[in-house]
Amino acid sequence: MEDFVRQCFNPMIVELAEKAMKEYGEDPKIETNKFAAICTHLEVCFMYSDFHFIDERGESIIVESGDPNALLKHRFEIIEGRDRTMAWTVVNSICNTTGVEKPKFLPDLYDYKENRFIEIGVTRREVHIYYLEKANKIKSEKTHIHIFSFTGEEMATKSDYTLDEESRARIKTRLFTIRQEMASRGLWDSFVSPKEAKRQLKKDLKLQEPCAGLPTKVSHRTSPALKTLEPMWMDSNRTAALRASFLKCQKR
């Protein structure tokens, strides 16, 4: 699973997921299913926000890569992926600027057009079950909830899906492709079932014992099958800007 994650996702997303896990004392090499889940969630958050801007009239518009316009403002503020201190700093700044109610839990995004925080969910189960779990945890009508599944289903607060159909279709297609690639490698069942994941982990540990002397360096070459998984939705300027924004706090 770890090899799959490193080949499947943008290196920046992998790096952010590793830092998020280490912040909570978790090891991506051991908890590989969680590693995959965090990377998937991060990518959905980025895809949710990418290409969406607000023009000078306050209208939401979509600008594809290659159509730069310095006057446009990103519609969504990405909160997910930052360390907790920086994330809460961003949330507090948004609340002070806009006057919106401060959430009890860190949300994933802020929508400047609708003036609301958004909680993104990606589930391997039924969307309505996961939605209810999220709603019960957040207990606030101020935070908008949007759940996606690997089967193409989605559910959102008051059936308000925020994004246009094409943008949501990109996310659903990506999730479905990830599921297919996991299944083709025999990884999907353990990703869905915690019990199966524990069984697979024990099996992997046993297999590693007699091979302790073998080289452990992982190849970073991408197979032809995985080239279709490479997230090309992030243009280079956007990637660089996001990377600088997320990682600058680590250098202080």
From Swiss-Prot:
Annotated site residues (Important for efficient shutoff activity and nuclear localization) in this chain: K195, K198, R199
Q: Which is a GO BP term held by this UniProt record?
A: viral RNA genome replication
One annotated GO molecular function is: RNA binding
Keyword list, A-Z: Decay of host mRNAs by virus, Eukaryotic host gene expression shutoff by virus, Host cytoplasm, Host gene expression shutoff by virus, Host mRNA suppression by virus, Host nucleus, Host-virus interaction
What residues form the catalytic site here? Answer: E80, D108
Q: Where in the cell is it found?
A: Host cytoplasm; Host nucleus
Enumerate the residues marked as the site Important for efficient shutoff activity.
K202, K203, K206
Main subcellular localization, coarse class? host cell
What the protein does comes down to:
Plays a major role in the shutoff of the host protein expression by cleaving mRNAs probably via an endonuclease activity. This host shutoff allows the virus to escape from the host antiviral response. Hijacks host RNA splicing machinery to selectively target host RNAs containing introns for destruction. This may explain the preferential degradation of RNAs that have undergone co- or post-transcriptional processing.
Q: Which family does it belong to?
A: Belongs to the influenza viruses PA-X family.
Q: What is known of its domains?
A: The probable endonuclease active site in the N-terminus and the basic amino acid cluster in the C-terminus are important for the shutoff activity. The C-terminus acts as a nuclear localization signal. The C-terminus is recruited to host protein complexes involved in nuclear Pol II RNA processing.
Instruction: State what protein this is by name.
Output: Protein PA-X
Q: Gene name, please? A: PA
